[in-house]
Amino acid sequence: MCPAKLKDEDVYYTKENVSLTEYKIHKYVYNLHIVNIPKIKSYNKETKQLKMVRVGTMSISDYYGESAENIDDELFTKIRNMIQTLYDHDILYVDITGYNFIENDKKLWIIDFEHAIYNHPRKTDEFVEKFLEGHNGWNPEFL
């Protein structure tokens, strides 16, 4: 008996309308190996499609619901550590919502660098500062 052949969409996820900047930041962060981020398979500048390895099918918000109150402190600590690590490597990640994090195989993954910026010189964001200081909640600008 032959094993079932996986479909392309089972292995890869294609994100539409990805700017060159988002692609470059995603690639930069992946190459740093500092946080779990999907591996890029390809990027098409003309169609603005980013094809990456699928790391799961449900975001934290899909799994726990949209309300930050449904998320336990331990998971928020993991997210906070991830955001701090990015910040320490000059990436300001402001789109802190449950839709941009995936738990799979006991790993936490971060996705969607559309609103992330290279942080030179160091810029600040009021919500990110509050979050890094211990606030457990999602950025209301992205809800």
Residue map of PLM features:
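Hydrophobic residue at the +6 position relative to the catalytic HRD Asp in the kinase catalytic loop
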Residues: I96-E103
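C-lobe/activation-segment region of protein kinase-like
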Residues: E74-L75, D88-L92, N104-L143
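Short, glycine/acidic-enriched loop or turn micro-motifs at the edges of active sites
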Residues: G56, G98, H115-I117
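ATP-binding glycine-rich loop module of kinase domains
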Residues: M1-Y28
